[in-house]
From Swiss-Prot:
Job of this protein: Component of the A-type ATP synthase that produces ATP from ADP in the presence of a proton gradient across the membrane. The B chain is a regulatory subunit.
Upper lineage: Archaea, Thermoproteota, Thermoprotei, Sulfolobales, Sulfolobaceae
Source organism (scientific name): Saccharolobus solfataricus (strain ATCC 35092 / DSM 1617 / JCM 11322 / P2)
Main localization (coarse): membrane
CDD domains documented for this protein: ATP-synt_V_A-type_beta_C, ATP-synt_V_A-type_beta_N, V_A-ATPase_B
Stated name of the protein: A-type ATP synthase subunit B
Pfam families associated with the record: ATP-synt_ab, ATP-synt_ab_N, ATP-synt_VA_C
Protein backbone atom coordinates (compact mmCIF):
# COMPACT_ATOMS: atom_id res chain seq x y z
CA UNK A 1 0.00 0.00 0.00
CA UNK A 2 1.32 3.46 -0.90
CA UNK A 3 1.88 6.11 1.75
CA UNK A 4 -0.18 9.31 2.02
CA UNK A 5 1.08 12.03 -0.33
CA UNK A 6 -0.06 15.67 -0.44
CA UNK A 7 -0.27 17.94 -3.48
CA UNK A 8 -1.57 21.47 -4.05
CA UNK A 9 -1.07 22.10 -7.76
CA UNK A 10 -4.49 21.90 -9.46
CA UNK A 11 -4.08 22.60 -13.17
CA UNK A 12 -7.74 22.36 -14.22
CA UNK A 13 -11.25 21.68 -12.94
CA UNK A 14 -13.66 20.28 -15.52
CA UNK A 15 -17.12 18.95 -14.66
CA UNK A 16 -16.73 16.37 -11.88
CA UNK A 17 -12.97 16.08 -12.55
CA UNK A 18 -9.96 17.73 -10.91
CA UNK A 19 -6.59 17.59 -12.73
CA UNK A 20 -3.61 17.50 -10.32
CA UNK A 21 -0.08 18.19 -11.59
CA UNK A 22 3.16 16.72 -10.29
CA UNK A 23 1.75 13.27 -9.46
CA UNK A 24 3.94 10.42 -10.69
CA UNK A 25 2.87 7.49 -8.50
CA UNK A 26 -0.94 7.59 -8.36
CA UNK A 27 -2.77 4.26 -8.60
CA UNK A 28 -5.97 3.62 -10.55
CA UNK A 29 -8.99 3.87 -8.20
CA UNK A 30 -6.81 5.29 -5.41
CA UNK A 31 -8.84 7.19 -2.79
CA UNK A 32 -8.22 10.94 -2.60
CA UNK A 33 -9.08 13.49 0.09
CA UNK A 34 -9.65 17.08 -1.03
CA UNK A 35 -9.31 19.80 1.64
CA UNK A 36 -10.65 23.19 0.58
CA UNK A 37 -9.40 26.53 1.95
CA UNK A 38 -12.45 26.81 4.26
CA UNK A 39 -11.65 23.43 5.85
CA UNK A 40 -14.39 21.49 4.02
CA UNK A 41 -13.29 18.00 2.99
CA UNK A 42 -14.44 15.97 0.01
CA UNK A 43 -13.45 12.60 -1.37
CA UNK A 44 -12.62 11.33 -4.82
CA UNK A 45 -10.98 8.58 -6.85
CA UNK A 46 -8.06 8.61 -9.28
CA UNK A 47 -9.43 7.51 -12.65
CA UNK A 48 -6.35 8.24 -14.76
CA UNK A 49 -2.69 9.15 -14.28
CA UNK A 50 -0.22 9.92 -17.05
CA UNK A 51 2.59 12.37 -17.83
CA UNK A 52 2.63 13.62 -14.24
CA UNK A 53 -1.09 14.52 -14.17
CA UNK A 54 -3.63 12.62 -12.06
CA UNK A 55 -7.32 12.97 -12.92
CA UNK A 56 -9.48 12.83 -9.79
CA UNK A 57 -13.23 12.20 -9.89
CA UNK A 58 -14.87 14.00 -6.94
CA UNK A 59 -17.75 12.24 -5.17
CA UNK A 60 -19.53 15.39 -4.00
CA UNK A 61 -18.93 17.35 -7.22
CA UNK A 62 -16.47 20.16 -7.88
CA UNK A 63 -18.76 23.13 -7.19
CA UNK A 64 -16.87 25.46 -4.86
CA UNK A 65 -13.49 23.76 -5.32
CA UNK A 66 -10.80 26.40 -5.86
CA UNK A 67 -7.66 25.80 -7.97
CA UNK A 68 -5.66 27.72 -5.36
CA UNK A 69 -5.37 26.92 -1.67
CA UNK A 70 -6.87 23.43 -2.06
CA UNK A 71 -4.88 20.45 -0.75
CA UNK A 72 -5.08 17.07 -2.49
CA UNK A 73 -4.07 14.02 -0.45
CA UNK A 74 -3.50 10.67 -2.16
CA UNK A 75 -4.37 8.13 0.56
CA UNK A 76 -2.60 5.11 -0.92
CA UNK A 77 -5.64 2.79 -0.86
CA UNK A 78 -8.90 2.18 -2.70
CA UNK A 79 -12.35 3.22 -1.52
CA UNK A 80 -13.26 1.03 1.43
CA UNK A 81 -16.74 0.68 2.94
CA UNK A 82 -17.53 -0.96 6.26
CA UNK A 83 -19.60 -4.04 5.46
CA UNK A 84 -21.76 -5.93 7.94
CA UNK A 85 -24.87 -8.06 8.34
CA UNK A 86 -26.24 -5.04 10.23
CA UNK A 87 -26.84 -3.38 6.85
CA UNK A 88 -29.87 -5.62 6.23
CA UNK A 89 -32.99 -3.58 6.91
CA UNK A 90 -31.07 -0.33 6.34
CA UNK A 91 -30.49 2.23 3.56
CA UNK A 92 -27.03 3.58 2.66
CA UNK A 93 -25.33 5.60 -0.05
CA UNK A 94 -22.45 4.06 -2.06
CA UNK A 95 -19.90 5.48 0.41
CA UNK A 96 -21.50 3.57 3.29
CA UNK A 97 -23.15 6.62 4.86
CA UNK A 98 -26.60 6.06 6.37
CA UNK A 99 -29.61 7.53 4.52
CA UNK A 100 -32.29 6.38 6.98
CA UNK A 101 -31.27 8.51 9.99
CA UNK A 102 -30.01 5.35 11.67
CA UNK A 103 -26.62 4.86 13.34
CA UNK A 104 -23.49 4.12 11.29
CA UNK A 105 -22.35 0.53 10.88
CA UNK A 106 -20.27 -0.29 13.97
CA UNK A 107 -19.58 -4.01 13.67
CA UNK A 108 -18.11 -5.26 10.43
CA UNK A 109 -15.04 -5.11 8.27
CA UNK A 110 -13.78 -2.55 5.78
CA UNK A 111 -13.64 -3.85 2.24
CA UNK A 112 -12.40 -2.35 -1.01
CA UNK A 113 -15.46 -2.04 -3.24
CA UNK A 114 -13.46 -2.74 -6.41
CA UNK A 115 -13.90 -6.49 -6.25
CA UNK A 116 -12.95 -8.94 -8.97
CA UNK A 117 -15.07 -11.20 -11.17
CA UNK A 118 -15.27 -14.79 -9.93
CA UNK A 119 -12.56 -17.12 -11.19
CA UNK A 120 -14.23 -19.39 -13.79
CA UNK A 121 -12.38 -22.41 -12.36
CA UNK A 122 -13.88 -21.73 -8.92
CA UNK A 123 -17.47 -21.44 -10.16
CA UNK A 124 -20.14 -24.01 -9.45
CA UNK A 125 -22.84 -24.50 -12.10
CA UNK A 126 -26.25 -23.05 -11.10
CA UNK A 127 -28.88 -25.76 -10.60
CA UNK A 128 -31.23 -24.59 -7.82
CA UNK A 129 -34.53 -22.88 -8.61
CA UNK A 130 -35.35 -19.46 -7.12
CA UNK A 131 -39.08 -18.81 -6.84
CA UNK A 132 -39.91 -15.19 -7.68
CA UNK A 133 -43.68 -15.63 -7.45
CA UNK A 134 -43.99 -14.27 -11.03
CA UNK A 135 -45.54 -16.88 -13.36
CA UNK A 136 -43.94 -15.60 -16.58
CA UNK A 137 -40.50 -15.94 -14.94
CA UNK A 138 -40.93 -19.06 -12.79
CA UNK A 139 -42.94 -21.04 -15.33
CA UNK A 140 -41.15 -20.17 -18.57
CA UNK A 141 -37.84 -18.41 -17.82
CA UNK A 142 -36.78 -19.78 -14.45
CA UNK A 143 -34.18 -17.94 -12.38
CA UNK A 144 -31.52 -20.17 -10.79
CA UNK A 145 -29.30 -19.57 -7.77
CA UNK A 146 -26.06 -18.02 -9.02
CA UNK A 147 -27.46 -16.89 -12.39
CA UNK A 148 -27.29 -13.44 -14.02
CA UNK A 149 -30.72 -12.70 -15.53
CA UNK A 150 -31.39 -9.09 -16.61
CA UNK A 151 -34.74 -7.38 -17.15
CA UNK A 152 -34.97 -5.16 -20.26
CA UNK A 153 -37.57 -2.45 -19.76
CA UNK A 154 -38.69 0.61 -21.68
CA UNK A 155 -39.32 4.17 -20.55
CA UNK A 156 -42.61 4.33 -18.65
CA UNK A 157 -42.96 0.55 -18.21
CA UNK A 158 -43.43 -0.76 -14.65
CA UNK A 159 -39.85 -2.00 -14.09
CA UNK A 160 -39.76 -0.40 -10.62
CA UNK A 161 -42.90 -2.25 -9.54
CA UNK A 162 -41.59 -5.56 -10.89
CA UNK A 163 -38.22 -5.06 -9.19
CA UNK A 164 -39.91 -4.28 -5.86
CA UNK A 165 -42.25 -7.28 -6.20
CA UNK A 166 -39.38 -9.67 -6.95
CA UNK A 167 -37.33 -8.27 -4.05
CA UNK A 168 -40.28 -8.88 -1.72
CA UNK A 169 -41.26 -12.34 -2.98
CA UNK A 170 -38.09 -14.09 -4.21
CA UNK A 171 -36.87 -17.04 -2.15
CA UNK A 172 -34.99 -20.32 -2.31
CA UNK A 173 -37.65 -22.80 -1.23
CA UNK A 174 -36.75 -24.53 2.02
CA UNK A 175 -34.11 -21.92 2.87
CA UNK A 176 -36.28 -18.83 3.31
CA UNK A 177 -34.54 -17.73 6.54
CA UNK A 178 -31.15 -17.70 4.82
CA UNK A 179 -32.20 -15.49 1.88
CA UNK A 180 -31.33 -11.80 1.55
CA UNK A 181 -31.77 -9.10 -1.09
CA UNK A 182 -29.24 -6.37 -1.87
CA UNK A 183 -31.13 -3.67 -3.75
CA UNK A 184 -29.05 -1.07 -5.63
CA UNK A 185 -30.96 1.97 -6.93
CA UNK A 186 -28.58 3.68 -9.38
CA UNK A 187 -29.25 7.33 -10.18
CA UNK A 188 -32.84 6.99 -8.97
CA UNK A 189 -35.25 9.91 -8.96
CA UNK A 190 -36.21 10.92 -5.44
CA UNK A 191 -39.82 9.73 -5.82
CA UNK A 192 -38.63 6.32 -7.08
CA UNK A 193 -36.23 5.93 -4.15
CA UNK A 194 -39.08 6.89 -1.80
CA UNK A 195 -41.39 4.34 -3.48
CA UNK A 196 -38.90 1.51 -2.90
CA UNK A 197 -38.30 2.53 0.70
CA UNK A 198 -42.00 2.84 1.56
CA UNK A 199 -42.88 -0.41 -0.23
CA UNK A 200 -40.24 -2.44 1.60
CA UNK A 201 -41.12 -0.88 4.96
CA UNK A 202 -44.89 -1.30 4.58
CA UNK A 203 -44.66 -4.92 3.42
CA UNK A 204 -42.09 -5.90 6.05
CA UNK A 205 -39.63 -6.96 3.33
CA UNK A 206 -37.13 -4.33 4.54
CA UNK A 207 -35.92 -6.76 7.24
CA UNK A 208 -34.14 -8.89 4.64
CA UNK A 209 -33.27 -6.08 2.19
CA UNK A 210 -30.21 -3.83 2.23
CA UNK A 211 -30.65 -0.75 0.01
CA UNK A 212 -27.73 1.09 -1.60
CA UNK A 213 -29.05 4.29 -3.19
CA UNK A 214 -27.63 7.06 -5.36
CA UNK A 215 -29.94 9.82 -6.59
CA UNK A 216 -30.28 11.29 -10.07
CA UNK A 217 -28.96 14.70 -8.97
CA UNK A 218 -25.73 13.29 -7.54
CA UNK A 219 -22.39 13.38 -9.42
CA UNK A 220 -21.85 10.59 -11.97
CA UNK A 221 -19.17 8.92 -9.85
CA UNK A 222 -21.76 8.14 -7.17
CA UNK A 223 -23.79 6.26 -9.78
CA UNK A 224 -20.77 4.23 -10.90
CA UNK A 225 -19.96 3.31 -7.28
CA UNK A 226 -23.49 2.13 -6.39
CA UNK A 227 -23.43 -1.37 -7.95
CA UNK A 228 -19.86 -1.93 -6.73
CA UNK A 229 -20.76 -1.20 -3.11
CA UNK A 230 -23.92 -3.32 -3.41
CA UNK A 231 -21.99 -6.29 -4.80
CA UNK A 232 -19.27 -5.94 -2.15
CA UNK A 233 -22.00 -6.30 0.49
CA UNK A 234 -23.55 -9.20 -1.46
CA UNK A 235 -20.17 -10.98 -1.57
CA UNK A 236 -19.75 -10.61 2.19
CA UNK A 237 -23.24 -11.94 2.94
CA UNK A 238 -22.91 -14.82 0.46
CA UNK A 239 -19.37 -16.03 0.97
CA UNK A 240 -18.74 -15.05 4.61
CA UNK A 241 -22.24 -15.43 6.11
CA UNK A 242 -23.39 -18.34 3.88
CA UNK A 243 -26.53 -16.52 2.71
CA UNK A 244 -28.33 -16.82 -0.63
CA UNK A 245 -28.27 -13.25 -1.96
CA UNK A 246 -30.33 -11.77 -4.78
CA UNK A 247 -28.67 -8.57 -6.05
CA UNK A 248 -31.11 -6.32 -7.94
CA UNK A 249 -29.41 -3.46 -9.82
CA UNK A 250 -31.77 -0.79 -11.18
CA UNK A 251 -31.21 1.09 -13.50
CA UNK A 252 -28.01 0.00 -15.30
CA UNK A 253 -28.80 2.52 -18.06
CA UNK A 254 -28.11 5.28 -15.53
CA UNK A 255 -24.80 3.59 -14.72
CA UNK A 256 -23.80 3.56 -18.41
CA UNK A 257 -24.89 7.18 -18.88
CA UNK A 258 -22.64 8.12 -15.94
CA UNK A 259 -19.76 6.25 -17.60
CA UNK A 260 -20.40 8.21 -20.80
CA UNK A 261 -20.52 11.52 -18.92
CA UNK A 262 -17.18 10.83 -17.22
CA UNK A 263 -15.65 9.65 -20.49
CA UNK A 264 -16.79 12.84 -22.26
CA UNK A 265 -15.30 14.98 -19.47
CA UNK A 266 -11.99 13.17 -20.01
CA UNK A 267 -12.28 13.84 -23.77
CA UNK A 268 -11.85 10.17 -24.62
CA UNK A 269 -12.52 8.93 -28.14
CA UNK A 270 -16.15 7.72 -28.02
CA UNK A 271 -17.14 4.22 -29.05
CA UNK A 272 -20.46 2.87 -30.30
CA UNK A 273 -23.38 5.20 -29.54
CA UNK A 274 -21.06 7.71 -27.87
CA UNK A 275 -20.36 5.34 -24.98
CA UNK A 276 -16.76 4.62 -23.98
CA UNK A 277 -15.07 1.76 -25.80
CA UNK A 278 -14.40 -0.02 -22.51
CA UNK A 279 -18.08 -0.16 -21.49
CA UNK A 280 -18.33 -3.89 -22.32
CA UNK A 281 -15.37 -4.66 -20.03
CA UNK A 282 -16.75 -2.39 -17.33
CA UNK A 283 -20.17 -4.06 -17.38
CA UNK A 284 -18.52 -7.49 -17.29
CA UNK A 285 -16.64 -6.60 -14.08
CA UNK A 286 -20.05 -5.99 -12.46
CA UNK A 287 -22.10 -8.83 -13.92
CA UNK A 288 -19.39 -11.46 -13.42
CA UNK A 289 -19.30 -10.85 -9.65
CA UNK A 290 -22.40 -13.06 -9.40
CA UNK A 291 -22.36 -16.82 -9.06
CA UNK A 292 -21.73 -19.84 -6.85
CA UNK A 293 -18.27 -20.78 -5.60
CA UNK A 294 -17.15 -24.38 -5.11
CA UNK A 295 -16.99 -25.16 -1.40
CA UNK A 296 -19.12 -22.16 -0.34
CA UNK A 297 -22.71 -22.54 0.86
CA UNK A 298 -23.82 -19.04 -0.14
CA UNK A 299 -24.41 -17.60 -3.61
CA UNK A 300 -25.05 -14.34 -5.46
CA UNK A 301 -27.85 -14.23 -8.02
CA UNK A 302 -28.02 -11.05 -10.04
CA UNK A 303 -30.97 -9.30 -11.72
CA UNK A 304 -29.75 -6.14 -13.46
CA UNK A 305 -32.63 -4.01 -14.72
CA UNK A 306 -32.12 -1.51 -17.52
CA UNK A 307 -34.17 0.86 -19.64
CA UNK A 308 -33.82 0.36 -23.40
CA UNK A 309 -33.65 3.84 -25.01
CA UNK A 310 -36.51 4.09 -27.53
CA UNK A 311 -37.40 0.44 -26.74
CA UNK A 312 -34.41 -0.55 -28.90
CA UNK A 313 -33.07 -3.96 -27.84
CA UNK A 314 -30.09 -3.46 -30.21
CA UNK A 315 -28.97 -0.34 -28.31
CA UNK A 316 -25.40 -0.79 -26.94
CA UNK A 317 -26.51 -1.12 -23.29
CA UNK A 318 -28.99 -4.04 -23.66
CA UNK A 319 -26.91 -5.49 -26.49
CA UNK A 320 -23.69 -5.72 -24.43
CA UNK A 321 -25.62 -6.81 -21.33
CA UNK A 322 -27.14 -9.68 -23.31
CA UNK A 323 -23.68 -10.89 -24.35
CA UNK A 324 -22.47 -11.09 -20.74
CA UNK A 325 -25.54 -12.39 -18.91
CA UNK A 326 -27.46 -15.66 -19.16
CA UNK A 327 -30.68 -14.59 -20.84
CA UNK A 328 -33.11 -11.68 -20.54
CA UNK A 329 -36.65 -10.87 -19.40
CA UNK A 330 -38.17 -8.36 -21.83
CA UNK A 331 -41.02 -6.01 -20.89
CA UNK A 332 -43.37 -5.21 -23.77
CA UNK A 333 -45.18 -1.92 -24.40
CA UNK A 334 -48.01 -3.55 -26.38
CA UNK A 335 -48.86 -5.83 -23.43
CA UNK A 336 -48.61 -2.88 -21.03
CA UNK A 337 -51.06 -0.90 -23.19
CA UNK A 338 -53.49 -3.85 -22.92
CA UNK A 339 -53.45 -3.46 -19.12
CA UNK A 340 -51.33 -6.54 -18.45
CA UNK A 341 -48.95 -6.52 -15.46
CA UNK A 342 -46.20 -7.58 -15.52
CA UNK A 343 -46.02 -6.96 -19.30
CA UNK A 344 -43.42 -9.70 -19.94
CA UNK A 345 -43.03 -10.72 -23.57
CA UNK A 346 -42.27 -14.41 -23.07
CA UNK A 347 -41.37 -15.01 -26.73
CA UNK A 348 -38.55 -12.44 -26.57
CA UNK A 349 -37.46 -13.57 -23.10
CA UNK A 350 -35.00 -16.32 -22.35
CA UNK A 351 -33.29 -17.97 -19.39
CA UNK A 352 -30.34 -19.94 -20.76
CA UNK A 353 -29.90 -21.98 -17.57
CA UNK A 354 -33.58 -22.69 -16.81
CA UNK A 355 -33.51 -26.26 -18.13
CA UNK A 356 -30.97 -27.27 -15.45
CA UNK A 357 -32.99 -26.04 -12.47
CA UNK A 358 -36.50 -27.31 -13.17
CA UNK A 359 -38.21 -30.69 -13.26
CA UNK A 360 -38.53 -33.59 -10.85
CA UNK A 361 -36.83 -33.01 -7.50
CA UNK A 362 -36.37 -29.30 -8.24
CA UNK A 363 -39.80 -27.86 -9.09
CA UNK A 364 -42.33 -30.39 -10.44
CA UNK A 365 -41.95 -33.32 -12.83
CA UNK A 366 -44.14 -31.75 -15.55
CA UNK A 367 -42.44 -28.32 -15.50
CA UNK A 368 -40.23 -28.73 -18.60
CA UNK A 369 -43.01 -30.18 -20.75
CA UNK A 370 -45.58 -27.58 -19.68
CA UNK A 371 -43.08 -24.77 -20.31
CA UNK A 372 -42.27 -26.06 -23.81
CA UNK A 373 -45.97 -26.47 -24.65
CA UNK A 374 -46.91 -23.00 -23.41
CA UNK A 375 -44.12 -21.45 -25.50
CA UNK A 376 -45.11 -23.37 -28.64
CA UNK A 377 -48.85 -22.75 -28.23
CA UNK A 378 -48.45 -19.03 -27.53
CA UNK A 379 -46.13 -18.63 -30.53
CA UNK A 380 -48.81 -20.22 -32.73
CA UNK A 381 -51.49 -18.02 -31.14
CA UNK A 382 -49.49 -14.89 -32.04
CA UNK A 383 -49.06 -16.15 -35.63
CA UNK A 384 -52.80 -16.89 -35.82
CA UNK A 385 -53.61 -13.33 -34.69
CA UNK A 386 -51.60 -12.03 -37.63
CA UNK A 387 -53.45 -14.36 -39.99
CA UNK A 388 -56.84 -13.35 -38.56
CA UNK A 389 -56.01 -9.69 -39.13
CA UNK A 390 -55.58 -10.45 -42.85
CA UNK A 391 -58.32 -12.98 -43.69
CA UNK A 392 -60.73 -12.38 -40.79
CA UNK A 393 -61.49 -14.57 -37.81
CA UNK A 394 -64.49 -16.20 -39.53
CA UNK A 395 -62.17 -17.75 -42.13
CA UNK A 396 -60.07 -19.51 -39.49
CA UNK A 397 -60.38 -23.20 -38.69
CA UNK A 398 -61.91 -24.36 -35.42
CA UNK A 399 -58.46 -25.22 -34.03
CA UNK A 400 -57.08 -21.81 -34.99
CA UNK A 401 -59.95 -20.09 -33.18
CA UNK A 402 -59.08 -22.12 -30.09
CA UNK A 403 -55.50 -20.88 -30.37
CA UNK A 404 -56.81 -17.30 -30.44
CA UNK A 405 -58.72 -18.02 -27.22
CA UNK A 406 -55.62 -19.65 -25.74
CA UNK A 407 -53.51 -16.56 -26.55
CA UNK A 408 -55.99 -14.28 -24.79
CA UNK A 409 -56.21 -16.54 -21.72
CA UNK A 410 -52.41 -16.91 -21.62
CA UNK A 411 -51.93 -13.14 -21.42
CA UNK A 412 -54.85 -12.45 -19.07
CA UNK A 413 -54.49 -15.41 -16.69
CA UNK A 414 -50.90 -16.66 -16.87
CA UNK A 415 -48.74 -13.61 -17.62
CA UNK A 416 -50.97 -11.09 -15.86
CA UNK A 417 -51.09 -11.15 -12.06
CA UNK A 418 -51.55 -8.74 -9.18
CA UNK A 419 -48.77 -6.56 -7.78
CA UNK A 420 -49.16 -8.31 -4.41
CA UNK A 421 -49.87 -11.76 -5.86
CA UNK A 422 -47.17 -14.28 -4.95
CA UNK A 423 -47.71 -17.50 -6.92
CA UNK A 424 -46.01 -20.75 -5.96
CA UNK A 425 -44.56 -22.80 -8.81
CA UNK A 426 -47.37 -25.34 -8.30
CA UNK A 427 -49.98 -22.59 -8.77
CA UNK A 428 -48.17 -21.33 -11.87
CA UNK A 429 -48.09 -24.79 -13.47
CA UNK A 430 -51.74 -25.46 -12.57
CA UNK A 431 -52.75 -22.20 -14.29
CA UNK A 432 -50.72 -23.33 -17.30
CA UNK A 433 -52.63 -26.61 -17.43
CA UNK A 434 -55.94 -24.77 -17.06
CA UNK A 435 -55.38 -22.58 -20.11
CA UNK A 436 -53.85 -25.45 -22.13
CA UNK A 437 -57.08 -27.37 -21.57
CA UNK A 438 -58.90 -25.08 -24.07
CA UNK A 439 -56.82 -26.72 -26.83
CA UNK A 440 -57.60 -30.19 -28.19
CA UNK A 441 -55.53 -32.85 -26.46
CA UNK A 442 -54.05 -33.79 -29.83
CA UNK A 443 -52.36 -30.35 -29.95
CA UNK A 444 -50.37 -30.98 -26.73
CA UNK A 445 -47.52 -32.60 -28.63
CA UNK A 446 -44.76 -31.34 -26.30
CA UNK A 447 -46.17 -33.01 -23.18
CA UNK A 448 -45.69 -36.68 -22.30
CA UNK A 449 -48.92 -38.72 -22.04
CA UNK A 450 -48.18 -39.61 -18.41
CA UNK A 451 -48.22 -35.91 -17.44
CA UNK A 452 -51.42 -35.25 -19.39
CA UNK A 453 -53.14 -38.07 -17.50
CA UNK A 454 -51.72 -36.85 -14.18
CA UNK A 455 -52.27 -33.07 -14.40
CA UNK A 456 -54.73 -32.25 -17.24
CA UNK A 457 -57.98 -30.85 -15.75
CA UNK A 458 -60.03 -33.38 -17.78
CA UNK A 459 -58.31 -36.26 -15.99
CA UNK A 460 -57.78 -34.73 -12.56
CA UNK A 461 -61.51 -34.30 -12.12
CA UNK A 462 -62.07 -38.05 -12.67
CA UNK A 463 -59.68 -39.18 -9.93
Amino acid sequence: MLSVREFSNISMIKGPLVYVQGVTDASYNELVEIEMPNGERRRGLVIDSQMGIAIVQVFEGTTGVSPTGTKIRMLGRGLEVKISEEMLGRIFNPLGDSLDNGPPVIKGEKRDINGSPLNPAAREYPEEFIQTGISAIDGLNALLRGQKLPIFSGSGLPANMLAAQIAKQATVRGEESNFAVVFAAIGARYDDALFFRKFFEETGAINRVAMIVSLANEPPVMKTLTPKTALTLAEYLAFEQDMHVLAILIDMTNYCEALREISAAREEVPGRGGYPGYMYTDLATIYERAGKVIGKKGSITQMPILTMPNDDITHPIPDLTGYITEGQIVLDRALYNKGIYPPINVLMSLSRLAKDGIGEGKTRDDHKDVSNQLFASYARAVDTRGLAAIIGEDSLSEVDRKYLLFGELFERKFVSQGFNENRSIETTLDIGWEILSVLPESELTNIKTQYIQKYHPNYRGKK
